Amino acid sequence: MVLLALGFNCITYYGTRLITGGFHHHNMSTKLDLIIPLVPWTIIIYLGCYLFWIANYWMGSIQDEDETAAFLCADLCAKIVCFILFITVPTTIVRPEIPDTDIMNKAMLFLYSIDTPDNLFPSIHCLTSWFCVIAVRKQKTIPDWYKVLSVIIALAICVSTLTTKQHVVVDTFAGIALAELAYLFVKKSGILGPYKKLVSAIESFIISICKGHKQ
């Protein structure tokens, strides 16, 4: 299940760029985005998110079978929506000019050089960070202080997407909303059964291939 989630995440974020390269990209910046300042040091939060993601997705994947399946199915459903939106509503952002004066500015320039300003709506940074909140909030074995800390970290990451000028406000809210809606959809729709069958079929296929290579 985890491999399926990771695989589709890569397809969503990187694969769609192969399709939308020549498309017109919309700028969803608002007046509020113009007010929000560039704060280069927040790149530490922006890039440090991966440690948070690994920890909380691991916690979300070791719950009881139904909760783990619901969490990962919601993640997959959300990424499918992202895939559709990245193609149908391609967006971009106008990044500020940053002087090459100190280490944080250099880090920002490096980030801009490796991450093109597209696939922004909704923000996958915010989406994934909020799924980290969903992953732990119902687990009785996880202390309340960590659940609160997860919310704080997730919100800090969302803010960092704005202060690094990687996203605009609508992207961040859309990411959080999509995470909640995807999880609610999985819980209410009955899609969990077909999802489990799909995962089981994929796992059986992979196992059969591995056995074939060994022989």
Residue positions per predicted region:
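Hydrophobic, membrane-inserted alpha-helices
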Residues: 52-56, 128-135, 152-160
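N-terminal transmembrane-helix/juxtamembrane module of multi-pass inner/ER membrane proteins
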Residues: 1-52, 99, 210-215
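Hydrophobic transmembrane alpha-helices
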Residues: 133-137, 179-187
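Membrane-interface loops
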Residues: 16-31, 61-145, 193-215
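Short hydrophobic alpha-helices at membrane interfaces in multi-pass membrane enzymes
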Residues: 143-155
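Interfacial helix-loop-helix junctions of multi-pass membrane proteins
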Residues: 117-121, 156-183
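Aromatic-anchored segments of alpha-helical transmembrane domains
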Residues: 10-11, 79-85, 152-163
